[in-house]
């Protein structure tokens, strides 16, 4: 008889999944989406929920159903060099290049920046704040102890309670009717796809491939061995966490939209969140928000530094040890953090436009692999075609100066002429399907059932 999780065990796994993906930094994207989407907010929310909630859940399920022992093992189904490249690229993205620096800049933007005089000294204040932030993060990454358990078990629930109070107050005292708020930017013409791409910024689908094995291993440790049962248990346990995440995203997004009655659309969601807290709850509300966000982001940064250092010390056993990697990643994160929150979000976009198609394709292949025996041929053709299209998406999302320097306008015109959905930022879909079709045809023609 197949072992099944009890209700208590489902609750435990669900709380783990929620803790894995939910971070204070994630809130800056739905609130910004809400301000930008205006009256088109519901279409935008749907797109956000697909990439910000649905894909992470599928990513964890993919690790379970494919019997993979982590990201490197899963991507090795293409080949080992690709696995090394993809694993390093993904961990650097959710690590020292973007996600870890974002922890510091989000804390600074939501908190200290709001009370500083606007006299041009913010660059110095950000440097001092981020230096202290990463000194603390490195300290705890090298000496994990009970403080992190306290932060996780006590602070996160307190943060959710405060967030709940803020959202309830904002929703019960709307500053504007949703129908009266004018959509801005791409949200005026294609809100669903703009929301879909905004979900990339959460990086949760990437995180699901990197850290999902932790949840899968917990389910296995609870006695569930059958791959289908592991995946099923992951999905069922994830329903609760996904619904909670979706509820938070929707509530915060609507609060962002309604705030447009008294606030202009902010440059980034960190500023918007702070302004909303100050408007509805005053200076005390802003202080509480800043304190809880800072500590929650610190916990996230410690976890990411630890995971990245462990991964790189395992990938390069003859290279630096864990302690050295942790120091390197902390210093690199400090450097990138001082670009500022808006710059980090802007510079991360091309990388996310490159990594997300590859991640989505890998998740789909892992989930559907039983239908073609996880044949390496299918993996190689699918990822190969996706890789080409992902490079195109990366080029299109580059900063304007770089984009123009590499003849970006000509490349963009070519793609929009020959790649369906390229103008929506989804030009990778058709190449991915073509690559998968070629791989499947070759697989079934040769009767090749070789396992990757």
Question: Which role fits each region the language model picked out?
Answer:
Residues 11-22, 92, 169-176, 185-252, ...:
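Hydrophobic, membrane-embedded alpha-helices of multi-pass small-molecule transporters
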Residues 54, 58, 158-171, 234-260, ...:
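Selective recognition of specific alpha-helical transmembrane segments in multi-pass small-molecule
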Residues 65-69, 73, 132-155, 221-224, ...:
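Membrane-water interface regions at transmembrane-helix termini and the short interhelical loops
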Residues 70-76, 248-298, 305, 314, ...:
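TM-loop-TM module centered on a large, flexible mid-protein loop between adjacent transmembrane helices
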Residues 96, 100, 160-187, 205-206, ...:
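Hydrophobic alpha-helical segments and their helix-loop junctions in multi-pass secondary transporters
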Residues 141-170, 349-360, 379-389:
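Membrane-interface loop-to-helix entry segments
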Residues 143-154, 192-195, 215-244, 262-274, ...:
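Hydrophobic, small-residue-rich membrane helices and short re-entrant helix-turn-helix hairpins
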Residues 173, 184, 375-452:
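A generic transmembrane alpha-helix motif of multi-pass inner-membrane proteins
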């Amino acid at each position: 008889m197949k072992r099944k999780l009890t209700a208590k065990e489902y609750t435990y796994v669900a709380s783990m999944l929620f803790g894995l993906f939910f971070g204070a930094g994630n809130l800056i994207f739905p609130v910004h989406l809400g301000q930008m989407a205006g009256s088109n907010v519901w279409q935008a929310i749907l797109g956000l929920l697909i990439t910000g909630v649905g894909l992470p859940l599928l990513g964890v399920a993919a690790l379970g159903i494919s019997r993979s022992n982590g990201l490197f093992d899963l991507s090795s189904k293409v080949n080992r060099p690709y696995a090394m490249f993809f694993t390093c690229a993904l961990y650097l993205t959710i690590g020292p290049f973007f996600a870890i620096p974002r922890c510091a800049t989000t804390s600074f933007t939501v908190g200290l920046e709001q009370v500083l005089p606007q006299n041009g000294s913010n660059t110095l204040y950000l440097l001092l704040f981020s230096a202290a932030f990463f000194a603390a993060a490195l300290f705890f990454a090298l000496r994990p102890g009970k403080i992190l358990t306290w932060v996780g078990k006590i602070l996160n629930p307190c943060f959710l309670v405060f967030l709940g109070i803020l959202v309830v107050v904002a929703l019960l005292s709307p500053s504007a009717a949703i129908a009266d708020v004018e959509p801005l930017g791409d949200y005026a013409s294609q809100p669903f796809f703009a929301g879909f791409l905004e979900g990339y910024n959460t990086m949760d689908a990437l995180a699901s491939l990197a850290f999902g094995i932790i949840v899968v291993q917990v389910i296995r440790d609870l006695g569930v061995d059958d791959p289908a049962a592991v995946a099923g248990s992951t999905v069922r346990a994830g329903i609760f966490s996904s619904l909670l995440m979706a509820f938070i995203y929707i509530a915060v997004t609507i609060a962002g939209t309604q705030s447009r009655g008294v606030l202009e659309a902010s440059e980034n969601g960190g500023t918007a969140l702070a302004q909303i807290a100050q408007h509805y709850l005053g200076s005390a509300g802003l202080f509480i928000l800043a304190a809880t966000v800072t500590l929650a982001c610190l916990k996230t940064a410690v976890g990411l530094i630890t995971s990245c250092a462990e991964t790189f010390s395992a990938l390069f056993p003859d290279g630096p040890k864990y302690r050295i990697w942790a120091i390197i990643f902390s210093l690199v994160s400090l450097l990138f953090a001082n670009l500022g929150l808006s710059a980090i979000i802007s510079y991360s976009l091309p990388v996310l436009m490159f990594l997300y198609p590859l991640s989505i394709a890998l998740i789909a292949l892992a989930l559907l692999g039983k239908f073609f025996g996880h044949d390496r041929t299918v993996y190689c053709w699918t990822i190969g075609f996706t890789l080409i299209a992902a490079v195109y998406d990366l080029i299109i999302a580059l900063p304007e100066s770089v984009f123009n320097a590499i003849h970006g306008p000509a490349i963009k015109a070519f793609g929009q002429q020959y790649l369906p959905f390229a103008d929506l930022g989804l030009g990778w879909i058709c190449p991915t399907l073509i690559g998968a079709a070629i791989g499947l045809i070759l697989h079934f023609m040769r009767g090749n059932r070789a396992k990757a």
